[in-house]
């Protein structure tokens, strides 16, 4: 199969029949909300408010949600027509050709590798902070990644990624049940923060709501709000993890749109509420450099016990995110192996009809990144790779509509206001990508060069055999 040759819909559908269709709308809502409302809601709002937007950070969240919403609608339609493992990779391979599908999938693979490592490291840092008052302190060699503050391996990051892989290895239904339990706790903690935080809001902290723009620092005005969008967009990318597991959905024509759109709507409401309460409790400048603004704001307001409880539940939230990312990433690796673009072993199922090799490959790579190497400078790569995949998917809606009822099934859910909304989704994703810092775009370029080299040196050659 050449770069431009389109993949066969029937082959993909038949190849994925081995998956057990066990995931319900509730499972997808739990995975989606758990992945979206994870590390970001407890870390980003204060930093973006202090660095870019002031109280106007809520507009950054809403604008990011608007762009993500356009893309989510496209994902919902795609997943009802093609409920395949691999999500964007499989869809783009069918619509535009294998080579373009590989580029989209390679972009998402960067997201999963780095995001699993990123969340694992965040889990480690928060757990160490939570246990410090109890006198628990790891030796530096086991507390930090290699070369960071005397560290050799971040042992907690290693163990939590390993645990998430074991749970996913047991099956998607087990992961879904655990996610449902943990996501309820996390949403309850967020709501508790909102209710308590409202009682200590000082209206003066909202003035001016949109601070004047400072061209020297980039702070304030619409420019500051848009700079916040590029940083915050990372918070909304979790709905791709739902689509990546669509091969395991019960009645995907109904469960997929409900899971994707529902999880995003819940996330938007919670993000906006937390952000408004946070900047109302204390001056936005007080959150500068603060990686745990929610817990800090509660402590400073005299709610130390609730602060500890929220931090503990935040850890549960990060664990849900790990489950979602490992689930989705392993299915993407399976799809690459299924099609011969990566070693065929990744495309094999075990006796329980699970892509075990994909699960362990993802876990091992993420452990190496998160436990042994400092990776903070790669964080924006998560957004960069995902945004490129999002652009492919929104453009793919035009090809999908032309082929529905011909060589592809009719969608049971269709993106509204066609052809305007797909275009807005593409343009919005492009603008957010353009707003990323230069290093993120540079590193994403290097990642894609590596991917293209692998495709022509290995994947394309294997496909021809």
Curated annotation (Swiss-Prot):
Subcellular location(s) per record: Cell membrane
Disrupted-gene phenotype: Deletion mutant shows a strongly reduced uptake activity of BCAAs and methionine. Deletion of the gene results in the loss of most of the BCAA uptake activity of L.lactis, and deletion of this gene together with a second BCAA permease, encoded by brnQ, further reduced the viability of the strain.
GO molecular function, one term: amino acid transmembrane transporter activity
A family per Pfam: AA_permease_2
Topology with respect to the bilayer: Multi-pass membrane protein
Residue ranges crossing the lipid bilayer per the database entry: 28-48, 56-76, 88-110, 149-169, 181-201, 219-239, 259-279, 309-329, 359-379, 380-400, 416-436, 438-458
Signal peptide boundaries: none
Induction, per UniProt: Expression is repressed by the transcriptional regulator CodY.
Gene Ontology cellular-component annotations: plasma membrane
InterPro entries per record: AA/rel_permease1
Location, primary (coarse class): membrane
Keyword terms of this UniProt record: Amino-acid transport, Cell membrane, Membrane, Transmembrane, Transmembrane helix, Transport
UniProt record similarity statement: Belongs to the amino acid-polyamine-organocation (APC) superfamily.
Task performed by this protein: Branched-chain amino acid transport system that specifically transports branched-chain amino acids (BCAAs) (isoleucine, leucine and valine) and, to a lesser extent, methionine. Important for CodY-mediated regulation, and required for optimal growth in media containing free amino acids as the only amino acid source.
Name of the featured protein: Branched-chain amino acid permease BcaP
Species this protein is from: Lactococcus lactis subsp. cremoris (strain MG1363)
């Amino acid at each position: 199969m050449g770069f431009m040759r389109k993949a066969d819909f029937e082959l993909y559908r038949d190849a994925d029949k081995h998956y057990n269709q066990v995931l319900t709308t509730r499972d997808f809502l739990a995975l989606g909300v758990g992945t979206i409302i994870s590390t970001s809601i407890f870390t980003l709002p204060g930093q973006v408010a202090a660095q870019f937007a002031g109280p106007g950070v809520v507009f950054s969240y809403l604008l990011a949600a608007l762009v993500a919403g356009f893309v989510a609608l496209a994902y919902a339609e795609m997943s009802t027509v093609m409920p395949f493992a691999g999500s964007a990779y499989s869809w783009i391979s069918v619509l535009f050709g294998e080579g373009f599908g590989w580029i989209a999938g390679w972009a998402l693979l960067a997201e999963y590798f780095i995001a699993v490592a990123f969340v694992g490291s965040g889990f480690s840092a928060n757990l160490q902070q939570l246990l410090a008052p109890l006198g628990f302190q790891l030796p530096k060699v086991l507390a930090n990644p290699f070369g960071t503050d005397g560290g050799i391996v971040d042992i907690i990051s290693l163990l939590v990624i390993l645990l998430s892989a074991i749970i996913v290895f047991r099956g998607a239904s087990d992961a879904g049940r655990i996610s449902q339990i943990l996501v309820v706790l996390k949403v309850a903690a967020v709501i508790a923060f909102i209710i308590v935080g409202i009682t200590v809001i000082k209206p003066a902290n909202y003035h001016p709501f949109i601070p004047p723009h400072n061209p020297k620092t980039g702070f304030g005005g619409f420019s500051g709000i848009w700079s916040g969008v590029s940083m915050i967009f990372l918070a909304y990318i979790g709905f791709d993890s739902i689509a990546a597991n669509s091969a395991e959905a019960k009645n995907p024509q109904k469960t997929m749109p409900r899971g994707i759109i529902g999880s995003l709507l819940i996330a938007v409401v919670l993000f906006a509420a937390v952000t408004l309460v946070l900047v109302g409790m204390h001056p936005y400048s007080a959150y500068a450099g603060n990686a745990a603004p929610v817990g800090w704001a509660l402590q400073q307001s005299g709610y130390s016990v609730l602060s500890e409880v929220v931090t503990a539940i935040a850890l549960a939230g990060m664990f849900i995110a790990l489950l979602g990312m490992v689930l989705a990433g392993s299915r993407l690796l399976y799809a690459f192996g299924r099609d011969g673009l990566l070693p065929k072993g990744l495309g094999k199922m075990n006796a329980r009809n699970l892509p075990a090799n994909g699960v362990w490959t993802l876990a091992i790579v993420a452990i190496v990144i998160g436990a042994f190497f400092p990776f903070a400078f790669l964080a924006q790569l998560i957004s960069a790779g995902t945004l490129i995949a999002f652009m492919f998917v929104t453009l793919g809606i035009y090809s999908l509509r032309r082929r529905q009822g011909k060589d592809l099934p009719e969608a049971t859910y269709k993106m509204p206001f066609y052809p305007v909304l797909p275009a807005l989704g593409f343009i919005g994703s492009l603008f957010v990508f353009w707003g990323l810092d230069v290093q993120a775009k540079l590193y994403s370029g290097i990642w894609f060069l590596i991917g293209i080299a692998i495709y022509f040196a290995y994947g394309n050659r294997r496909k021809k055999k």
